[in-house]
């Protein structure tokens, strides 16, 4: 629906992407506190929140509007706080250091090197999220 409406209304690409993101993830964002670290990281990656943090803000605002629409809704949208805190944890991982440690001085083919680095960075981010979830308050 978001895709068809965006095409019909000729909305800017950024708006179309935000609508697509909200349509795909709004139910998951509402229950973000219950997500496992892998799903949480997938959400951060899907929102492209590391490169474009504004997209996460747009997603959270859309989700908050949906959640706060009933008259008896709470004044605070806790999933937004939780997801923003998770993003801080993910950003706290030094991807450059992880990449250097993952490859060392090994001479790997470019594709294998990129795959090794991507897997190591994901593992480090997951470890950071696991540690955070053990200590984070709901």
Task: Name the predicted role of every residue range.
Residues 1-138:
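C-terminal subdomains that position terminal phosphate/3'-OH groups for nucleotidyl transfer/ligation
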